[in-house]
């Protein structure tokens, strides 16, 4: 089974977590795109969705799924999104596509967070995938220096990339994240950081992991 086939399978499985007649949250990225395509087959069962990026909103609308402004929504039943890495406690690194801030906001509002990924994303210690940090542009060099001094790793500005919020992304390479919650909090305390790609203080409730033998369900 190829990686795309595993993503397709977990996306189909995630439909079981979609609650009828509710508004759901939808993430951003290649696995989330598989889910959006799958969601289109049951779109009449839901009121619509809150999108975590402009790209996701466009894909939802292309499928005829109503997209809601989060400020006009009182509740989100379920948030479904992929991940760049997950540990066994369902702490995540997200934001490889640069949508981490909006993803984190929608995940915070949602009653439950279902993460969908292929088996390559499950690791014992996170950090092999560069950790994204969204920063205010004028603070980029200051934040880089603070990360080098206080966190470690190698922070680099992502070239030719601006977030939907008009900000820069710093990617921190060569990390070993042994305490995800503490690192998430510490990074967010640096002036100029909007947020970082660690989803530990609000991790996933369920991880649907695509494997060659089917979908493995891990709960927290």
UniProtKB/Swiss-Prot annotation:
<comment type="subunit">
    <text>Homodimer.</text>
</comment>
<dbReference type="GO" id="GO:0005829">
    <property type="term" value="C:cytosol"/>
</dbReference>
<dbReference type="Pfam" id="PF06026">
    <property type="entry name" value="Rib_5-P_isom_A"/>
</dbReference>
<dbReference type="InterPro" id="IPR004788">
    <property type="entry name" value="Ribose5P_isomerase_type_A"/>
</dbReference>
<keyword id="KW-0413">Isomerase</keyword>
<feature type="binding site">
    <location>
        <position position="121"/>
    </location>
    <ligand>
        <name>substrate</name>
    </ligand>
</feature>
<feature type="binding site">
    <location>
        <begin position="94"/>
        <end position="97"/>
    </location>
    <ligand>
        <name>substrate</name>
    </ligand>
</feature>
<dbReference type="GO" id="GO:0006014">
    <property type="term" value="P:D-ribose metabolic process"/>
</dbReference>
<dbReference type="InterPro" id="IPR037171">
    <property type="entry name" value="NagB/RpiA_transferase-like"/>
</dbReference>
<feature type="binding site">
    <location>
        <begin position="28"/>
        <end position="31"/>
    </location>
    <ligand>
        <name>substrate</name>
    </ligand>
</feature>
<comment type="pathway">
    <text>Carbohydrate degradation; pentose phosphate pathway; D-ribose 5-phosphate from D-ribulose 5-phosphate (non-oxidative stage): step 1/1.</text>
</comment>
<feature type="binding site">
    <location>
        <begin position="81"/>
        <end position="84"/>
    </location>
    <ligand>
        <name>substrate</name>
    </ligand>
</feature>
<comment type="function">
    <text>Catalyzes the reversible conversion of ribose-5-phosphate to ribulose 5-phosphate.</text>
</comment>
<feature type="active site" description="Proton acceptor">
    <location>
        <position position="103"/>
    </location>
</feature>
<comment type="similarity">
    <text>Belongs to the ribose 5-phosphate isomerase family.</text>
</comment>
<dbReference type="InterPro" id="IPR020672">
    <property type="entry name" value="Ribose5P_isomerase_typA_subgr"/>
</dbReference>
<protein>
    <recommendedName>
        <fullName>Ribose-5-phosphate isomerase A</fullName>
        <ecNumber>5.3.1.6</ecNumber>
    </recommendedName>
</protein>
<dbReference type="GO" id="GO:0009052">
    <property type="term" value="P:pentose-phosphate shunt, non-oxidative branch"/>
</dbReference>
<dbReference type="GO" id="GO:0004751">
    <property type="term" value="F:ribose-5-phosphate isomerase activity"/>
</dbReference>
